Regions:
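Aromatic- and Gly/Pro-enriched, solvent-exposed loop/edge beta-strand patches characteristic
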Residues: 90-171
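Intrinsically disordered, low-complexity segments enriched in polar/charged residues with Gly/Pro
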Residues: 57-59, 83, 120
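Residues within well-ordered beta-strands of beta-sheet-rich folds
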Residues: 5, 69-71, 81-86, 97, ...
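Extended extracellular/luminal ectodomain segments enriched in beta-structured repeat modules
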Residues: 74-82, 91, 138
């Protein structure tokens, strides 16, 4: 048997250790592999509303592409350095945009492209911006992402309450939007009962 150590603590098994049979038929299902990890102090602040991470995915009309956005309120003297989100399938192309002065959903049309590229494999990625973006003090800003995922018709990773394990998590703590073409937007929280998995990273004082 394999001897495993639970990374979530010592409550399960024998103080966190447990056995898995070589003949177990489920051990290879839903596997996650970390190939590269950044330092936890890469950036000064993180903006996020998806504390559970990806619980599921969604899309539009069996299309491989979609837009999604999250809105946050900047602190003092911050610059936006990077964003992170999921590729729900291999060979996902992406464009990242920023709206530095967000007042309502119509401002998402005034987005400025700050990064683009392709993610070869399905997974979770941190994308550094081409240049740091200064943010206005105490003002809302929006991060917008367009993805095209060739092998998936559910290109948006979302957080939502899907079973008893996630029933008590708050999905009303964000302001997210989704769109097929980036023109007509719907609220992730109010109309789709979910949060968008899209984080923003800033440095203070740069």
């Amino acid at each position: 048997a394999f001897i495993c150590k639970n990374s979530w603590g010592q409550d399960f098994g024998d103080e966190g250790f447990f056995y898995i049979s070589y003949y177990d038929t489920n051990i290879g299902m839903n596997s996650v592999v970390y190939t590269k990890l950044g330092n936890s102090d890469n950036y000064d602040k993180i903006y996020q509303s998806d504390l559970m991470g990806e619980v599921g995915t969604m899309g539009f009309d069996d299309r491989p592409e979609a837009y999604f956005a999250n809105v946050y309120t900047a602190g003092k003297n911050e610059t936006l350095k990077a964003v992170s989100f999921y590729a729900t399938g291999p060979k996902t192309t992406y464009d990242v945009y920023v709206v530095t002065d967000f007042t309502d959903v119509s401002d998402l049309q005034q987005r400025t492209k700050v990064a683009s590229g392709e993610m070869q494999y399905e997974g979770y990625y941190t994308i550094n911006l081409n240049e740091a973006v200064p943010l206005a003090d105490d003002r809302k800003f929006a991060v917008v992402v367009h993805v095209n995922t060739q092998d998936s018709t559910m290109p948006i990773a979302i957080e939502y309450n899907n079973d008893e394990k996630t029933a008590n998590f708050d999905i009303t703590d964000g302001e997210g939007y989704i769109s097929l073409y980036g023109t007509k937007w719907s609220s992730a929280e109010q109309e789709n009962d979910c949060n968008v998995c899209l984080k923003a990273f800033t440095d203070v004082g740069d």
